[in-house]
Amino acid sequence: MTKKEQFELEYVLKTSPKVLDKLLITPDGLSEWFAEDVIVKDDVYTFHWDGSEEQARLLHRKTGEGIKWQWIDDEEDGIETFFEMRYMIDPMTKVVILSVVDFAEPVDKEQVVRLWESQITDLHRVIGA
């Protein structure tokens, strides 16, 4: 198995941290843009997309800051990866900067980046930006 490599993407969002908290942290909010359905039991999030499902364990969540998970499949395979969405207000421009940190095998990175671009386009649509 090829080692997954970390990458980070940044996006400017014209929204408030309060709105972003709902969309990034709550199952209902995530279901509006990230997955078709999100079910949470204890610290395990089950994401449903196009008839498939993936599970991720919550590693960190903080209102006003963001959320971080590890895919259960990676955890079971002993692969130390995570995916994270964190945000801050730029002190100069006062816009919200969303940083997405994820991992992908080098051969898959371009496809994973395109998937994130599509997801963030959906997020922009939901927030009306």
Show which residues each predicted segment covers.
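Hydrophobic ligand-binding cavity/cleft-lining segments
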Residues: 1-38
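A generic structural signal for beta-strand entry/edge sites
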Residues: 4-6, 44, 64-66, 92-97
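Short, surface-exposed coil-to-beta transition loops
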Residues: 6-8, 52-56, 78-84
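Generic structural detector for well-ordered beta-strands
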Residues: 8-14, 46-48, 57, 86-88
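A short, structured loop/turn motif at beta-sheet edges
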Residues: 17-18, 59-64, 87-96
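Hydrophobic pocket/interface hotspot
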Residues: 20-21, 30, 45, 58, ...
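Glycine-rich portal/gate segments that line the openings of hydrophobic small-molecule binding cavities
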Residues: 28-75
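Beta-strand/loop substructures that line and gate deep hydrophobic ligand-binding cavities in soluble
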Residues: 70-125
